[in-house]
C-alpha cells in the first residue's frame, strides 16, 4: 500500500491494524500524530526559507505583519488596510478572515518549496526583496530597517499576482478580476468543494492540525491567526452539526492517538519518508520537533520481513531540502533515492510473502 500525506497515514495505519491483509506499505509525509495545535507547521516554512537564503524575506514579512496588525487594531484604519490589499468589499471581512487570505503567499510551499512558479513563495520573495533606491537585491536585513513595515506591507499588497492567487484559493472575485462575475471579496464563505468539505470534517472532528501563528521570532502569520480562529472556521463550516452536537467543541485528537497509536507506532514492513522542510513532518513519525518523542534514530537499514523496529528506531529517510511528498515527484534526486530504498526493502521482504 503506497500513499503520501493523508494517504500516507492510511498506508501506515492499515498495515498496522490489518497486517494479514496489507503486506507492506510506503508511508510518505504522513502526520500520524493527531494534535490540535500545529503552529509548528510555520516553523518548517521559516526553516525552509532561511536554508534557501531568504532570511531577509522572513524578516520583512514579520515587519509587514506587525504594521498590518497594528492597523487592524483600530477600526478607523482596519478598513483601509483591507482595501489596500484586496480593494473595495474587502473591508467586510473579519481580521481573522482577512489575515487568513494573506497566507496565500505560502500556498505552494508544501508542494514546491521555494519554487512554485509565478505564485510561489520564491517568486514573492524575489519580488519583495528589491531595494527601491538601487533597484538591486536587498541585503541580509531586508527592507524594513531602512524603509519601515508600512513600505513593505504596501509593496506586498502590490505584488501583481497576489489578488489573482487569493481569488483562486478563496473562490472570490476581489477587485472584479473576473469581469463576467460580480464583485465578491468575502473570505468567510464555507468550502463548497466536496473533497475540501470532507477533509475539513476530518480535521475538525478528529485530527486537529490547526495551523495558527507560530508566535515568536520565527512568526510568519498575523497574530489574528489564533487557535480560536481555527475553531471558528470549523464551527462556521458545519453550523448544523454544532447545533445537533455532532461537531465536538474541539477535535478529539487524544482519542485518535489512543486508538491508533500516533507517532509511537512501529508496524513491520513499512517504510517512512519525509521532506526536511515539509511542514507536515512535524507530526510524522520522522518528526524532530521538541514535542515529538526524543532519542529516536532514523535508519535506512532494512529490517527483516515481519520484524518491527524498536521504539527508538524508525526505518525511514528524510529527504534533504525537500517538502511534502517529494518522493512522488520525478525530478528531485532525493525523491529517487527514497523510492529506491522502498524498492530495495520490497525485494528483501517479498520472499516471505504469504508466510507471515
Tell where the protein language model's regions lie, with residue ranges:
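Short beta-strand immediately N-terminal to the catalytic nucleophile in serine-hydrolase-like folds
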Residues: 1-3, 28
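His-enriched metal-coordination microenvironments in redox/metal-binding proteins
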Residues: 5-11, 280, 324
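Short glycine-enriched nucleophile-adjacent loop
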Residues: 6-19, 25, 32
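Extracytoplasmic/secreted proteins, especially bacterial periplasmic and envelope-associated proteins
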Residues: 10-13, 56, 60-63, 76, ...
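A short acidic (Asp/Glu
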Residues: 10-14, 37-38, 282-285
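Short secondary-structure boundary/capping segments
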Residues: 16-19, 40-45, 286-292, 333
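A catalytic-pocket lid/entrance helix-loop region that shapes and gates access to the active site
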Residues: 21-141, 145
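C-terminal subdomain of alpha/beta-hydrolase-fold enzymes, centered on the catalytic histidine
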Residues: 103-356
